Each structure stands twice: as C-alpha cells, then as structure tokens.
Amino acid sequence: MNELNTKHIVIIGGTSGFGLQSAKTLLVKGAKLTITGRDKNKLETIIHELKAISETVAGKVLDASKEDTLKQFFEEIENFDFMISMAGGFMGGGFLDAPYETIKNAIDEKLFLNLKIARYAANKINDNGCLIFTAGSGGRADNASGAIIGNESISIMVKGLAIELSKRKIRVNAVAPTWTKTPLWRNMNKEEVKNIETYFSNTIPLGRTATIEEVSSAYIFLIENSFINGQTLKIDGGLTLL
C-alpha cells in the first residue's frame, strides 16, 4: 500500500503552477487533498479536473493575505499530515530605486504571511508531519531587493521552526526554485516573458529553465523523505553557484 493513502495534505495555492502539479502527483499516490485558491470559479473548475484522478480532493476558497479568513480556514479544516504553502509574491527593483512600500510588501508577502500560516498550521498538523514553504533562488539583490530578503527569511524561518517543532517530530523545509515559466506570469507581455526566459536559459549552467514538473517533484520529495529537516532545497540548475 502506498504510504500516502491515509495522509491528508493541504496545499495553499493549489490551482496553478507548482501547486497544481503537486496536487496531481499526490492524488496519483493516493493522498487525500485540500487545496485552496482565491478565485471560486477557477477553484471549482480545478477540483472538477482533479476528481478525474481521484475523488479524495476538496477545495476551499482562501485569500491567505487576509488574516481573518486564514484563521477561519485553519479552524475549519480537519487535522492534516503535510502542508505545502505556495504563498508569496515577487517584485523588481533595487534598494535605492524601488518604492519603500514595494520592498516592504514583498517581505510581508514572503516572510510574515508564511509565518502566520506556520503558526496556524502548527495547531492542526499531526505529529510526524511536515510543513513545506516556498522561497526562491537565483535573484539579484540589486533588482529584486524585497524578494531577496523575503526568500532568505524563509530559509531562516524553516530552520527555527524545525527546531521548535522537533519534539513532535514535525519537519519543516522549503523549496527554492529560480525563475520558471508558470501561470504566475500570465498577465505579463508574452515577449517580455520570452526575454526573461531567454536570459535565465543563457545564465543557468544547465542552459535552460526548469519545467513545472521538475520543481513540483521537489515538494513531493520533501514529503516522502522523512529525514530531511530545516533545509531549503534549491531547484535552480546551478544558478546560485555562479
């Protein structure tokens, strides 16, 4: 029997990109899923598609940036074994040219939003479980200032949480992908997206960007490997080696 057959897994931000692909893989592996999304209609469509894989999936509308709804979400859901958080934004601009509020918001959306999620999740996760957050890899401090701080803060946060939750044998890790072509960029001009992809392909040592499947498999790996704790797994093709 697959060891995920009896496991309840929550994915915050599971209607597109890495979250959706992770959901598909976990359903194939027999897990019971609760996924969230901000858009009710999109969430319903995705749940319908996922039920073609397995009926063991449910959806909850959630805007994680609103603390009252975040608190209510965790109060209402059943206890779970694993959680994946895709929460966090992105930004461009250096420390001198980006608006102060833009930098501050980028940090808030990465560190403090995920810290709130961690605190609520700690009360609902079963012993021997795992919390997985999303950081980022390969950005430059001079053109992604707030995002860099936020991503580094996630790595520090998971180390602290891993120790604090170790008495309950709960692991805490993060996945840090570099730029990947996902629906996150759907509102950007196609030519601009192509230029960004070309830039990263020419910069990454492997000569290309990652696929959604390659990144999402890291979340699955961290769920299934029960001896990885307090780590941030960089999925960047060696970009941070440069």
Model-inferred region functions:
Residues 208-235, 240:
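C-terminal substrate-recognition "lid" of short-chain dehydrogenase/reductases
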Residues 96-116, 154:
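Catalytic Tyr-X3-Lys loop
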Residues 106, 117, 130-167, 179-180:
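Catalytic loop of short-chain dehydrogenase/reductase
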Residues 15-17:
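Conserved glycine-rich cofactor-binding loop
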Residues 85-104, 186:
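Conserved mid-core segment of classical short-chain dehydrogenase/reductases
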Residues 50-67:
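Rossmann-fold cofactor-recognition segment
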Residues 40, 140, 176-187:
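Short, flexible catalytic-loop segment of classical short-chain dehydrogenase/reductase
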Residues 155, 165-181, 228-235:
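Conserved Rossmann-fold SDR core element
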